From Swiss-Prot:
An individual GO BP term: killing of cells of another organism
Keyword Transmembrane helix attached: yes
UniProt name for this protein: Holin-like protein 24.1
Protein task: Probably functions as a holin together with holin-like protein 26. Accumulates harmlessly in the cytoplasmic membrane until it reaches a critical concentration that triggers the formation of micron-scale pores (holes) causing host cell membrane disruption and endolysin escape into the periplasmic space. Determines the precise timing of host cell lysis.
Organism this protein belongs to: Bacillus phage SPP1 (Bacteriophage SPP1)
CC terms in the record's Gene Ontology section: host cell plasma membrane; membrane
Record's keyword terms, sorted: Coiled coil, Cytolysis, Host cell inner membrane, Host cell lysis by virus, Host cell membrane, Host membrane, Membrane, Transmembrane, Transmembrane helix, Viral release from host cell
A Pfam family that the UniProt record links to this protein: XhlA
Membrane topology: Single-pass membrane protein
Transmembrane regions: 57-77
Compartments, record wording: Host cell inner membrane
Coiled coil feature spans: 1-45
Amino acid sequence: MEQMRQDIIELKQNDKSQEQRISLLERTSDRHDQQIQAVTESLSKIHENTTWIKRTITGAIISTLSTVVVGGILTIVWNLVKN
């Protein structure tokens, strides 16, 4: 009978220990979820900035090419008119 009581006490202690471990794991999991969410938001902002930079560079390239083409055409026309 005494052995059964000791076993029950031991089981209750193990149960408390398991509950504490589970609680710790749940808190850790919650922190990880928050960190993942923060990283996801940061990646989204980086993606938005990258898109803006790509558009700016593309616009600059198109402007440069347009200037070169128009300048070349004007030079050709000027030389034709001059001669």
